[in-house]
C-alpha cells in the first residue's frame, strides 16, 4: 500500500493503492463529499485479494486533496470525471475497471461518455441515470409531491439522515457519533450494522482530513449533468454492471433497472438487504459480484 499525490489541472489529488501493480487496475470513485476513506480499507483489500490493483482517491474538496472555496473555484462533473482520469495517469494506468458509488456513479457515467478509451469495465452502485434530477426529486419529496420521472424519489430514511447531518455537533466524539447515526439510518435494517466498526472508520476519516471535524460540503453546490446526456449512454460499449441495493433510500428500486436500461451492455445485480452504506456485512457479496464482472470483462 502506497500513497501518491497526482495533479489534475490546477488541483492536487491524494490517492493510495492496494494489491499488486502488475494486476489489472480497478479505480474506486466515491460518492459526494466523501474522501477515499469512504471505501473502507477492508473492502479495498478484499478486492485486491481477488487479483486487482485497487486505487482510490480523494475527490477535490475532500480529505487531503486540494480544498478551495467553491464559489471562487466552481467546477462540474466534467472536471470530476477528468480528475478520475488524472488519477489513472498518475499511477501509469492506461485502462482500468472503474467502480462508482452514489455521486461516483454519475461521475463514472460521464467517464464512459467522455473518456471511454480508459475503461476496461464499468460498475455503478447506489446511483441513478443521468436523466434523473435527484436535486429536484428531493425538493418534490419534501413537499409531498411525486417525482416527474415516474421513479420513486428519496425515501424517509434519507430525509432523516439529511436532517441529522444539519445538526451541529460539539467536539470529536459527538461528531463521530453523529456520523455513525447517519450511516446507521442510511444502511437500514436489512443487514447487520456495527456501530463500533463505523466509529473506527469515521475516526480514520477525520484523521485523514487532518483532524477537521466538519464534513465536506462543496459537492452540494454541483449542478448535475444535462439530462439530455443520458441518450448518449446508448453508445456505451464497455462491459457494464449496475448494482441495486435492495433497501437503498436514495436511489431505491427500480433506479438500478432504469440505469441498466440506458446502456446496451449493462446487466443488473441486486445485493439483498443492502442500504446506502458499506458496512462489512455487505463487503463479501458486493466484492463477489464486482470481481465476477471484472473477470468476465478481461
Swiss-Prot record:
> How activity varies with pH?
Optimum pH is 7.5.
Q: State how activity varies with temperature.
A: Optimum temperature is 37 degrees Celsius. The activity at 30 and 45 degrees Celsius is 58% and 87% of the optimal activity, respectively. Exceptionally high temperature stability.
Which InterPro entries would you find in this protein's record?
AB_hydrolase, AB_hydrolase_1, AB_hydrolase_fold
**A single GO molecular function, which one?**
triacylglycerol lipase activity
The alphabetized UniProt keywords are: Antibiotic biosynthesis, Hydrolase
GO biological process: any one? glycerolipid catabolic process
Q: Does the keyword Hydrolase apply?
A: yes
Active site at 102, 248, 276
UniProt enzyme class = hydrolase
Which residues are in the AB hydrolase-1 domain?
A: 24-277
Q: Which reaction does it catalyse?
A: aclacinomycin T + H2O = 15-demethylaclacinomycin T + methanol
**Which Enzyme Commission numbers does its entry carry?**
3.1.1.95
Pathway connected to this protein: Antibiotic biosynthesis; aclacinomycin biosynthesis
Pfam families hit by this protein: Abhydrolase_1
Query: Which PANTHER family does the record match to this protein?
Result: AB HYDROLASE-1 DOMAIN-CONTAINING PROTEIN, HYDROLASE, ALPHA/BETA FOLD FAMILY PROTEIN
| Biological role | Involved in the biosynthesis of the anthracycline aclacinomycin which is an aromatic polyketide antibiotic that exhibits high cytotoxicity and is widely applied in the chemotherapy of a variety of cancers.
Similarity comment text for this entry? Belongs to the AB hydrolase superfamily. Hydrolase RdmC family.
Q: How does it assemble?
A: Monomer.
UniProt name for this protein: Aclacinomycin methylesterase RdmC
Gene name tied to this protein: rdmC
Amino acid at each position: 500500500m502506497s500513497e501518491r499525490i497526482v495533479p489534475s489541472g490546477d488541483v492536487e489529488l491524494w490517492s493510495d493503492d492496494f494489491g499488486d501493480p502488475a494486476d489489472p487496475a480497478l479505480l474506486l470513485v466515491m460518492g459526494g463529499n466523501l474522501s477515499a476513506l469512504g471505501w473502507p480499507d477492508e473492502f479495498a483489500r478484499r478486492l485486491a485479494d481477488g487479483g486487482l490493483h485497487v486505487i482510490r482517491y480523494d475527490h477535490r474538496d475532500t480529505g487531503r486533496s486540494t480544498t478551495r472555496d467553491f464559489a471562487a473555484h466552481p467546477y462540474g462533473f466534467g472536471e470530476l470525471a477528468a480528475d478520475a482520469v488524472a488519477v489513472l495517469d498518475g499511477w501509469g494506468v492506461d485502462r482500468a475497471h472503474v467502480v462508482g458509488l452514489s455521486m461516483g456513479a454519475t461521475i463514472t457515467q460521464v467517464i464512459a461518455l467522455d473518456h471511454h478509451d480508459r475503461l476496461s469495465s464499468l460498475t455503478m452502485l447506489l446511483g441513478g441515470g443521468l436523466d434523473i434530477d435527484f436535486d429536484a426529486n428531493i425538493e418534490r419529496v419534501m413537499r409531498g409531491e411525486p417525482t416527474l420521472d415516474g421513479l420513486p424519489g428519496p425515501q424517509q430514511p434519507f430525509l432523516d439522515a439529511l436532517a441529522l447531518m444539519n445538526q451541529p455537533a460539539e467536539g470529536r466524539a459527538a461528531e463521530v457519533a453523529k456520523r455513525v447515526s447517519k450511516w446507521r439510518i442510511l444502511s437500514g435494517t436489512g443487514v447487520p450494522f456495527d456501530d463500533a466498526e463505523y466509529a473506527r472508520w469515521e475516526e480514520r476519516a477525520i484523521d485523514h482530513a487532518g483532524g477537521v471535524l466538519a464534513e465536506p460540503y462543496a459537492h452540494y453546490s454541483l449542478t448535475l449533468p444535462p439530462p439530455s446526456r443520458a441518450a448518449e449512454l446508448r453508445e456505451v460499449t464497455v462491459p457494464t454492471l449496475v448494482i441495486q441495493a435492495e433497501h437503498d433510500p436514495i436511489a431505491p428500486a427500480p433506479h438500478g433497472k432504469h440505469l441498466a436500461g440506458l446502456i446496451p451492455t449493462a446487466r443488473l445485480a441486486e445485493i439483498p438487504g443492502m442500504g446506502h452504506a458499506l458496512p462489512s456485512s455487505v463487503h463479501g457479496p458486493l466484492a463477489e459480484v464486482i470481481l465476477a464482472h471484472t473477470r468476465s470483462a478481461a
